Structures are given as C-alpha cells and as structure tokens.
C-alpha cells in the first residue's frame, strides 16, 4: 500500500467518523420538532424489529409536533408503543392511521444533560479521529521500515495526518457549538 493510499483511506474514514457524529447528534432533542428525533426508533413489526422509516412517513407538523403516517393500520399500536418506549420523553397519540407526537419543552436540567451528551459524542468522535491518525502513522512507519519511503516522506505523512485531524476536529467542534446553541435556545 502506498503513502497516498494510506492517506486517502484515513481521510475517508475520518469523513465517516464526522458523518456518524453528525447523525448521532441529530437524534438529540432540541426545543424544536425534527424528524431525526425518531431516526433511531425501532418497531416490532411482522415478527422482526424494523426502523420506523420502514413502517411509515415521519413529518414535522409544526415547531412542537411530529406526525407519523403509518402505512399499515395494524401497525399503529406497535408504532405508538415503540415511540413511547424509545426513552425520548415523548408521548405519542394515535389518531386513526396517524400518530401525533408532541414535543414537550425541555427543562433546564434536561437541556444541560443533552449538552453534556453532545460533548461526550464529540469527544468520542475526536478520539476516533486520533486513532485513525495513529493508524495512518503506523502505516507510514511500516513503509519506512520496508524501505519503500524515506524519512522526508514519513515526516510529510505525519504533517498531513496532523492537518487532517485538525480539520475534522474543527468541524466536530463547530457542530458541538451549533448543537449546544440549538439545545439551550428557549
């Protein structure tokens, strides 16, 4: 494997780490209704556990209400139970083939918990980036040991790794600040 391939592979994994972090924090409640809130909800349907997205459509009705349109009427009760049991602090109400999910306002204590959770996810993502950096440098060490690259190329690889980690850590930090602002907004 060449130095370029090692760098490209590491950068692709770093991008995935940032995307994964973005997906995780999208599911953290803010004061507003967002469909991402129900992304992780799994419904017991047809003898298996399925994501809510495969059971029906989720839409935002207004700033504090989500509406779930269930495709199969027999799945309304199971879907309502799954939302209630998802530990999101939501109380869904079935209305025919739809389920109305009111998003209650967050109290100060809950907001602080969500900010702390966001920061924890951010720190986990940053740790993943640093591990990928270590992996990248290990690959460069191996190439140098096998006499495929020189010290200068290895030093450049280290510089590239540091720049990549810095770039993606900044993206994560910016996302944390933005999410914190959304959570604390009353």
From Swiss-Prot:
It comes from the Bacteria. The keyword Ion transport does not apply. Responsible for the release of ribosomes from messenger RNA at the termination of protein biosynthesis. May increase the efficiency of translation by recycling ribosomes from one round of translation to another. Gene3D superfamilies: 3.30.1360.40, Ribosome-recycling factor (1.10.132.20). This is Ribosome-recycling factor. GO terms for biological process: cytoplasmic translational termination. Keywords: Cytoplasm, Protein biosynthesis. It is found in: Cytoplasm. It comes from Chlorobium phaeobacteroides (strain BS1).
């Amino acid at each position: 494997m060449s130095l370029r391939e090692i760098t490209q592979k590491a950068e692709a994994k770093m991008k995935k780490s940032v995307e994964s972090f973005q997906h995780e924090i999208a599911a953290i409640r803010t004061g507003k209704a967002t469909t991402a809130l129900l992304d992780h909800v799994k419904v017991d349907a047809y003898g298996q556990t399925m994501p809510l997205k495969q059971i029906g459509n989720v839409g935002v009705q207004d700033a504090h209400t989500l509406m779930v349109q269930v495709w199969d009427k027999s799945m309304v009760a199971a879907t309502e139970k799954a939302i209630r049991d998802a530990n999101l602090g939501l109380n869904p109400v079935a209305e025919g083939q739809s389920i109305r999910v009111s998003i209650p306002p967050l109290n100060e204590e809950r907001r602080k918990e969500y900010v702390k959770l966001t920061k924890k996810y951010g720190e986990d993502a940053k740790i993943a980036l640093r591990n990928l950096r270590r992996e990248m440098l290990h690959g460069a060490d191996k190439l140098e040991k096998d006499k495929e690259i020189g010290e200068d190329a290895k030093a450049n690889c280290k510089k590239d790794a540091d720049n990549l980690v810095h770039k993606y850590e900044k993206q994560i930090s910016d996302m944390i600040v933005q999410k914190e602002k959304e959570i604390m907004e009353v």
